[in-house]
Amino acid sequence: MAPAKFYFSETSIYQELLKFIPADAKVILELGCGNGTIASEYKQINPHCRYIGMESNPQLAKNAAAQLDEILVGNIQQNISTLNISPRTVDCLIYSWNLMDISNPTEILKYCQSLLKNDAQVLVIIANLQYWHKIINLLKGNWENSEIIRHWLSLESLKSDFATAGLQIYEVQTRGEKGEEFEKFLKLTEPLVDALGLDRKKFTTQTAAEYFIVRATRSPIPPRRLLIQTIIMDPKVCGTVRVLEPDKFSATIPGVRTISTVKTADLNLGWPQEEKVFIWQRTILSYPSDLHKLKSLLEKNYLIVAEIDDHPLRRPEYAENNYLSYRGCHCVQTSTESLAKFLRQYNPNVIVFQNQLAKIPLLSEHNFPNDSYPSIFFGAVNRELDWKEIMPIINQILSDHQDKIRVKVIHDELFFKSLNTANKEFYPFCAYNQYLEILASCDIGLLPLNDIQINQMKSDLKFIECAASGVAVLASPTVYKNQIIDGETGLIYYSVSDFAKKFRKLIINKNLRERIVNQAYNWVKNNRLLCQYYRQRRDWYLHMIDELPRLNEELKNRVPELFS
């Protein structure tokens, strides 16, 4: 049986569903898993999940088998009871678009409800029979094949079916193509809408949606509503890792909305009964001219959070403004404990959210090329003092290998120009995805950091990015000695001569590189994926919101001008 016809592409619909799957699910059941597209993507986010699929199309099921842990081929209505799943073990139930293919969806929902944990989520995509394209096609006599869909569902009937099955819908989102043609449709149907006594606004909403994304839960307790709103002041540096990816994961938690904007913010986006967090990412607040911004947030009942992942001493403006960026907030989130210790002298309410990776791609054969000459990666900002003393060694080793070793450099043009080889590539500062692609094309990563205060407070993000990308690292002890097991998950150098020795070793010993890559990859997979930690943020924000009376008193003592 063919799935319901959509005007949107299958890929875009799968991507929409992927946004809402809880990133830390231990067991997922997808009914109508197709060729395993969602499972394949999700397994990079959470490789430890047990992903079970059911598919009636044998060919699609065959293609999906490699992506899923288990798959059952057969008619959902007839065969669902044969699934090897214990009651109350499923964290997320997904219906792609096949719920309407089932003659009695309520029966299936009831059965699946028995498999769900108390806090499990249900995700469903439902085609909208009132979509304006469908109405036009019907009027033209081009109604879609009725055999494709056995059970048309409206939003109201869907809510009834879910309630009967003991499931509570807590959110419905719409997707659909609008544009000029939709506006023409509304204009043409306006007399009919008025003649039938229909509400124009409701009609517009109902006909604009090609399909609904329905989110439900087994729990009868409504989720606590939270808006996480971030103003990104430095999108190029760590905006993805520190804001965008955590936001995506937080948005999978029932009741959580996330909004991020660059350098501007609308403070009127909160919904009724929604608690609010406002996060300043890498923001230098001016004293006293920016006090009014903080006052506005206090008046709107926001929890005010500063987000910083680099040492403030790099920017004298922080001190020049009496560290208002941290003193003027309720609390601070940062990336390392050493940085947190520094920040606590300006605000005692500091928490560490380590940098984690949102996904980990599969290691493949391209990670271990057969040719004998590896590629070297170097990519960093403000590192000249860190690499200066090892540059002669790098050039000597490149020369010893007759310039057959390729070096790829991101952003650091001086490092690139200092390389005495023609076998090199330079890339300017680039988008995060492109950065990861370049990184994954290399074999050895160089991570030098001198032992100075600013460097001591940096995170180990570069190492975990290399490890997840199949790149063996040669790193300084500063920052990395506490994370890298020397000789197992990477190599640590303690002097220039030690760097030379270990760099040569990594270049000529392919077996050593492979062993390091595999062990580092597995360490990151087991310890440093965002799916293992993302709920900490939401839990901490809610805890801080509960503590707002205390936090406001402390804030008043630090910056009394905010309350005058």
Residue ranges of predicted features:
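Nucleotide-sugar-dependent
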Residues: 314-315, 385, 433, 437-438, ...
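Conserved acidic donor-binding segment of nucleotide-sugar-dependent glycosyltransferases
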Residues: 486-497, 505-511
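Conserved N-terminal segment of class I S-adenosyl-L-methionine
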Residues: 1-88, 185-186, 209-212, 233-245, ...
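Extended catalytic core of nucleotide-activated donor transferases of GT-like folds
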Residues: 96, 259-342
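N-terminal pre-catalytic "stem/leader" segment of glycosyltransferase-like enzymes
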Residues: 219-285
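Conserved catalytic-core segment of nucleotide-activated headgroup transferases in glycan assembly
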Residues: 232-255, 359-360, 369-440
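S-adenosyl-L-methionine-dependent methyltransferase catalytic module, highlighting the catalytic core
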Residues: 103-111, 121-220
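A charged, aromatic-enriched C-terminal amphipathic alpha-helix characteristic of glycosyltransferases
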Residues: 360, 508-550
